[in-house]
Structures are given as C-alpha cells and as structure tokens.
Curated annotation (Swiss-Prot):
An annotated GO BP: venom-mediated disruption of cell wall in another organism
Molecular-function annotations in GO: serine-type endopeptidase inhibitor activity
Lineage of the organism: Eukaryota, Metazoa, Chordata, Craniata, Vertebrata
PANTHER family: ANTILEUKOPROTEINASE (PTHR19441:SF44), WHEY ACDIC PROTEIN WAP (PTHR19441)
Biological function: Damages membranes of susceptible bacteria. Has no hemolytic activity. Not toxic to mice. Does not inhibit the proteinases elastase and cathepsin G.
Name of the protein in question: Porwaprin-c
Keywords (A to Z) from UniProt: Antibiotic, Antimicrobial, Disulfide bond, Secreted, Signal
Record-annotated disulphide pairs: C34-C60, C43-C64, C47-C59, C53-C68
Length: 75
C-alpha cells in the first residue's frame, strides 16, 4: 500500500473514532435502589446498564448476575 493510501486510511480511522456514538454510560442512572436478591441462580447477564431495561427498571448486579428489576425507594 502506498504512503498516500496509508495516510488516507489513518485519517478515516481517526475520523471514525471521533464520530462514534455516545454510549449509554454517559446517561444518568435511573432513580431508586436495587431490591435484595432472594436466591442465587447461575450467572446470567440480562442487561449491561439501566438503559437496557424497560420502563423504570434498573440493571441490578448481584455478584455475577445482572438483571432488570423494579427499583425500591428508601426515605
């Protein structure tokens, strides 16, 4: 590949890295706390963050388990 082709490729890669979409990690977390887990099933990853859960549910971590749960609110 010629040096011009390499420079073009490098420029396109740089532009692509700058234009990647904003991740859900940049969003604020949903309100409330995760309720306690009543039992210990095998490791399951149902979600990665709150925004992968429907409605007001939160992505709750219990050890190696990630699941969508209704939040609890503590006064």
């Amino acid at each position: 590949m010629s040096s011009g082709g390499l420079l073009l490729l490098l420029g396109l890669l740089t532009l692509w890295a700058e234009l990647t979409p904003v991740s859900s990690q940049d969003r604020p977390k949903k309100p409330g706390l995760c309720p306690p887990r009543p039992q210990k099933p095998p490791c399951v990853r149902e979600c990665k963050n709150d925004w992968r859960c429907p409605g007001e549910q939160k992505c709750c971590r219990y050890g190696c388990i990630y699941e969508c749960r209704d939040p609890i609110f503590v006064k």
